Amino acid sequence: LNRSVKIKQVVDALEHYAPLPLQEGYDNAGLQVGLTEAVEMSGALLCLDVTEAVVDEAIRKGCNLIVSHHPLIFRKLARISDENYVQRTVRKAIKNDITIVAMHTNMDAAAGGVNFKIAEKLGLRNVQFFAGEKEVDGVKGGEGVIGEVAEDLAADDLVLMLKERFGVECVQCNQLLRRPIRKVALCGGAGAFLLDAAIKAGADAFITGEMSYHEYFCHEQEIQICVIGHYQSEQFTGEIFRSIIQENFPDAKCCISEINTNPILYL
């Protein structure tokens, strides 16, 4: 028996797991497009970014809810026309009665959120926050996590593990660390702001999605920097959304998007 689930119930479950007040001040997580109150959910499509192709996929799969990591509407929209992909995507969603919700820096910060998922993929133990700790509605939050590998790794073996588990062909690193790596700190997406905190926390390695040129300097033999790509670092976020929805609504239809929305090609 498929008991009907309202979109609002699903959104509430997601926000209970990662309360919106955990988000950064600059962010626009939460409802992006559409209605939640009285609408029954036909299915949820889970993704990292919402593009027109993702809305088409939702239509094809009979999903009237899209849950994304990155907000579709980040900067204020001056108008809704067809000048750029955001406007076109908003129009397409509205025309097809699709509701779009984003769980961004609130899901980055939440216990069991994006960074914990990355740590899980790396098999880290004793995973805990090492910076920016706070608590909202009984949910603990923080800016980055640190944990220990099961057994000490050489730097090149850590790089190999990242390539395998995150499906990347290239990892941007500073000079390879000559001591074994035990403590690993990480932050999905753009995490360079946590590099100093990672060093202070005693990390042997710091893994993130993107860093700029000058941020790599002056850390030789102090910490191993591994940068795997913004999209690549957060690619498993849909699995978090899926487990929250399945746990609360076992009969609800939810599927992870098959579209790779990474705009960066590695050629």
Residue ranges and their predicted role:
Residues 1-267:
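Hydrophobic structural segments
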